């Protein structure tokens, strides 16, 4: 009897392993998967605060770029769409101290356009990328209207 139970447990374990081997994490429709995140590239132009709120309405934040590889991925999608895109970066709370607004963490990685950030006119407190800046970043007034990139972690796995 004990041997039968043990064999049954092995069979169940093997079935579970086979099922979860085909486990796929998916992004919502309209979002793009990369690494451990899903990204949404807007085609609407909004100021930085409204763009951030739009991302939050979808349980996401404006994108935080942490590596050169992630930066290159985001740029590769943006070039197909055209335009400038807001990221989550700001120095609104302390001039010259750039941080990711959603985490309050200082930049560990950055890719500023040569000579940037400049804080031109004393009011450039938000980070954008794309357009003529290519993979580079620039600071801009948060009240300007641009497209934006949202980021969220992959949703729970779907077994299939």
Specify the residue positions occupied by each region the protein language model found.
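Extracellular, disulfide-bonded carbohydrate-recognition/adhesion ectodomains
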Residues: 1-160
């Amino acid at each position: 009897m004990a041997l039968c139970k043990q064999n049954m447990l092995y069979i169940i374990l093997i079935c579970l392993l086979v099922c979860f081997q085909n486990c796929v994490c998916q992004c919502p429709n309209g979002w793009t998967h990369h690494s451990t995140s899903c990204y949404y590239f807007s085609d609407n132009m909004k100021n930085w605060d409204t763009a951030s709120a739009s991302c939050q309405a979808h349980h996401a934040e404006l994108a935080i770029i942490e590596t050169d590889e992630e930066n290159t991925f985001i740029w590769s999608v943006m070039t197909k769409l055209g335009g400038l895109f807001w990221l989550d970066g700001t120095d609104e709370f302390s001039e010259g101290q750039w941080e990711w607004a959603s985490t309050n963490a200082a930049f560990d990685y950055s890719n500023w356009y040569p000579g940037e950030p400049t804080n031109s006119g004393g009011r450039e407190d938000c980070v954008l990328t794309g357009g003529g800046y290519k993979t580079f970043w620039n600071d801009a007034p948060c009240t300007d209207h641009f497209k934006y990139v949202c980021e969220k972690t992959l949703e729970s796995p779907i077994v299939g």
